[in-house]
């Protein structure tokens, strides 16, 4: 009996050690990623400020570099907000508060948050008739997660494009489909786009702004609620993201 108890105790200690080592590696990776993400906008901001010290600059040139500085400050603010959310989620400091409520209302709030940005690119966001499913979910964070996918669609859809949002019911899940007619995603990148700080080839090619955290946060928020996110896409034919939450 004592031998069995010692064996169990030894196994528990080993598992705890492995868990702590994994958490340590995750923390180191997060710090490295954060440092890398902050480096570019900080370098740009530093460069603009150095140039602004030049007394020979014209007023127009000063306005131009001030505008660039403000743009980089805005980027940093958005990035820091995303980084705070990621670190809090990964450290389990954010406690999701699921309650039984209308998923339709949550989707509409996410739609409203993205509406002006879509209008600025003349992109139609079409909300097809949504059934009012009452399911257990965290309203605030689920709205944030849905917004991230819509916002991603806006970034990769050309002027005058279209995004369609639908909802459907399967045996165990309620599905939210967000489909765009944008540039599409290479099949090889399907797994990578949900990784922390990953920015796809189209992102770099077209110079699309973004931190590479939106889809990662969405995946984390949905998985923490027993759900998931899937993507179907083809280069040049747009993308369809399906977000699922248990009924």
Predicted segments, located by residue:
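Conserved micro-motifs of the catalytic ATP-binding
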Residues: 91-96, 134-138
